[in-house]
């Protein structure tokens, strides 16, 4: 199941939980246009990371939860703003370091042609950067052997390293 399907399922879960039974009500609740919602439902478009962050901020959950199967979208966390792009860049940098990939060519090679070197560079620019849509994130995650939501999930220090001495 790709992240757009999961996103749509989670939006439907929200709609049911909040008794939102029309596109207009759901769109108003999420602060998006009805057209956007219909395009997502029909899979002719997918939300950007920025839009994912805006929706998550509106409903009070982590952005990654919206693209995680049965994600905790009802968590009602208190945070200033989600920033999936920043987390994506941080996670990719860490992955590149772990894999010993230092040149742009080596980094792009990890994605088996799904992401060009130029596109990858554009994601990392400080200004006038681009962010990958969900479909591209799915391809990137697939190439790295990870679920898509993990690319935009901030990993806590204790999750990065297992400090238990006995894993039994």
Language model: regions and residue ranges:
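Helix-turn-helix DNA-binding elements, focusing on the entry/boundary residues of the two helices
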Residues: 22-23, 49-52, 104-105, 137
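Central "turn" residue of the DNA-binding helix-turn-helix
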Residues: 31, 60, 102, 113-114, ...
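Recognition helix of helix-turn-helix/homeodomain-like DNA-binding domains
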Residues: 31-47, 113-131
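A short, Lys/Arg-rich alpha-helix, primarily the initiator
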Residues: 1-20, 73-106, 110
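DNA major-groove recognition helix of helix-turn-helix
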Residues: 15, 41, 51, 59, ...
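Short C-terminal boundary/hinge segments that cap the last helix of small helical domains
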Residues: 60-79, 145-162
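The alpha-helix within a helix-turn-helix
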Residues: 27, 56, 108-110, 141
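DNA major-groove recognition helix of helix-turn-helix/homeodomain DNA-binding modules
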Residues: 50-65, 133-150
